[in-house]
């Protein structure tokens, strides 16, 4: 791969996009000065967790605009040289596919950087998500399916009917992006023509042209990334909409870091140099005592698993954890959470019970498996936010018990648990439990009771049926 000085700003619509990279920063807040500092060095990468998949389109657009405007800076502020903005989203095509890249392009254009093309590469190789002849596929229980045939396509908010990515873009844009106007970088272009041919295809794109990137392997995406590097050196501007895999070659990384026991144990140590605790507890006597206790290894012996995702794979993974019979289970009943007369008592009872149990056993808390949704996408999002808020309150209530580790299952769940439940402002991706899947975050800026607590981000639609149980077993064995 060509070395690139690009600074990669990744707007991640849930916390799962960094699972194919390591030693990169992950910010949970929109602090413009902080983001510019993380991008100070050429070749640096910073993920900003926007959680926009949990927002309506207008709010998602506003968040994208705010972040990019902040990083570009106002009068007197120097924008990071060589900035490439990535709109990172789902490898099974959910999210605000059209609106978010356009919001980013609007800001770049206002700053004098008109966007030539949107690169669309939803692949996640490790999870069996790839694109061939412009059709996107997902391997489900060993069977290759067009993504329109999977339960991901039935999502209450972001459902879709097409797997051909050109037709998908036309569908999602309401016809504003005609399928026959979408360019394509084919596998033949990549494997037979190489960088030179891909440069030729991309050089023909202008005016925010959508370009589908076909990819079956990382080597395919590396060729495309090299072509992008060459064209950016000539002044061309691209915005990328992609799944997790394409971020790795854009960031200049050639391999994954699979964590061993020592690396997992190291995540329990001190935060990275330059990190700071959150302002809410810093400087207090109680905070100092708590930080000292946590760093001295006084965390509870047992950890907490939080499950919020409702995709079929997550339910099967939860069942595998239950079958091993090694955790105490707590169910948050969605019907009770949506009933104002029972909501508060249900949350308080759950917090109290988990805090007591962490002294004896690992715990798993999950929302009831019956999906509650309506035909109105905005109302479905409101229900999801109400349930997510309850999960966050449970975690916030439990964190003072200093769990040994926390695993969050589900994209929206893991963002909310990290930021609002555990109070994480900035973290470093230590690596993954499996190649390109399931990241371990080391909190760098967080409340003292969270510093030193390894945090595992486990997407709802990733991993084999035993993967969640295996991650819990590895965390448990490291702590012994």
Protein language model regions, located:
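Conserved, well-ordered active-site substructure
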Residues: 24-27, 403, 412-463, 467
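Short beta-strand segments
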Residues: 11-12, 47-50, 87-88, 119-123, ...
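Cap/lid and interdomain-hinge subdomains that line or gate substrate/regulatory clefts
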Residues: 1-12, 19-22, 35-37, 42-44, ...
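Gly/Ser/Thr-rich loops at beta-strand to alpha-helix junctions
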Residues: 14-17, 89-99, 125-127, 216-220, ...
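Short acidic, glycine/serine/threonine-rich loops at helix termini
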Residues: 20-23, 96-100, 129-137, 222-227, ...
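C-terminal structural cap/anchor segments
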Residues: 354, 358-411
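N-terminal short beta-loop-beta anion/metal-coordinating cradle
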Residues: 19-49, 349-358, 429-448
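Conserved, well-structured core segments that form the ligand-binding/active-site neighborhood
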Residues: 135-274, 279-283, 287-350
């Amino acid at each position: 791969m060509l070395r690139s000085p690009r600074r990669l700003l990744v707007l991640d619509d849930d916390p799962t996009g960094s699972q194919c990279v390591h030693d990169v920063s992950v910010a949970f807040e929109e602090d413009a000065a902080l983001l510019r500092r993380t991008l100070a060095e050429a070749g640096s990468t910073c993920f900003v967790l926007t959680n926009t998949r949990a927002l309506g389109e207008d709010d998602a657009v506003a968040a994208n605009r705010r972040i990019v405007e902040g990083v570009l800076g106002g009068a007197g502020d120097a924008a990071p040289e060589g900035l490439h903005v990535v709109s990172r989203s789902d490898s099974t095509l959910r999210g605000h596919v059209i609106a978010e890249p356009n919001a980013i392009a609007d800001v770049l254009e206002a700053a004098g950087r008109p966007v030539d093309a949107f690169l669309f590469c939803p692949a996640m190789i490790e999870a069996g998500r790839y694109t061939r002849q412009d059709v996107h596929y997902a391997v489900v229980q060993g069977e290759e399916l067009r993504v329109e045939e999977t339960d991901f396509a039935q999502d209450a908010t972001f459902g879709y009917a097409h797997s051909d990515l050109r037709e998908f873009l036309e569908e999602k844009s309401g016809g504003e992006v005609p399928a026959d106007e979408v360019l394509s970088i084919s596998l033949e272009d990549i494997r037979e023509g190489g960088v030179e041919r891909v440069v030729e295809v991309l050089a023909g794109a202008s005016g925010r042209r959508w370009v589908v990137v076909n990819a079956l392997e990382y080597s395919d995406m590396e060729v495309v990334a090299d072509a992008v590097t060459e064209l950016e050196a000539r002044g061309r501007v691209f915005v990328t909409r992609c799944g997790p895999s394409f971020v790795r070659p854009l960031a200049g990384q050639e391999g994954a870091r699979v964590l061993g026991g020592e690396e997992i144990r190291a995540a329990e140590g001190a935060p990275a140099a330059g990190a700071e605790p959150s302002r809410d507890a810093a400087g207090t006597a109680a905070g100092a005592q708590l930080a000292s206790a946590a760093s001295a290894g006084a965390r509870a012996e047992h950890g907490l698993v939080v499950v919020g995702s409702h995709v079929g794979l997550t339910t099967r993974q939860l069942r595998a954890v239950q079958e091993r019979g090694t955790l105490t289970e707590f169910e948050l009943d969605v019907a009770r959470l949506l009933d104002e007369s029972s909501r508060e008592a249900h949350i308080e009872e759950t917090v109290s019970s988990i805090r007591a149990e962490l002294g004896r056993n690992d715990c798993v808390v999950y929302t009831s498996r019956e999906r509650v949704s309506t035909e109105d996408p905005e109302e479905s999002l409101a229900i999801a936010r109400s349930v997510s808020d309850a999960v966050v309150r449970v975690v916030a209530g439990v964190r003072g018990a200093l769990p040994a580790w926390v695993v969050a299952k589900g994209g929206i769940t893991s963002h909310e648990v990290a930021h609002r439940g555990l109070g994480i402002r900035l973290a470093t991706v230590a690596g993954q439990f499996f190649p390109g899947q399931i990241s371990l975050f080391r909190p760098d800026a967080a409340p003292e009771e969270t510093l030193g607590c390894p945090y595992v981000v486990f997407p709802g639609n990733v991993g084999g049926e035993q993967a969640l149980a295996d991650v819990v077993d590895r965390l448990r064995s490291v702590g012994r």
